[in-house]
Amino acid sequence: MRRTRGLAAAALLVSLHCALAEEGPAALSWETLAQVSVTHQRGRYAPKFSTQLIALDKKAVTLKGFMVPFDQGLAQTRFLLSAEPAECPDCLSATAEQFAEVVAKTPLKYVIDAITVCGTLELVRDDSGALLYRLTEAVMVDK
């Protein structure tokens, strides 16, 4: 019971973060996420983000896409959000800007249909081979 109350309170705080963001969360599109190029500097590859993306870094945004879970199970706290449905692995785009890592504040129920999540956008600038985008403290705002 106490854990359920704690999870509900955490979800409410994240929802407030998205709802109370100055002027509301920005609606982010996959076209905007495609505004990135890769440069080669000092033997490493580094993303070069557009000024529009840089302005959204560390801001509350919403993004619509399809869940691609890392783990089995119905409850997901960390997953990929894809521009395209994951029903057919051969149909997915191979480009990094077509995916965003989502770290949910509370577990989200896995669904096949498109969802909209709200979270804090992080531009991933390191050369770790990770994705280019991460949404943290994310909550589902629409299925």
What are the residue ranges of the model-derived segments?
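Positively charged n-region of N-terminal signal peptides that target proteins for export
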Residues: M1-R5
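Bacterial N-terminal signal peptides
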Residues: G6-H17
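OB-fold and OB-like single-stranded nucleic-acid-recognition modules
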Residues: A21-K143
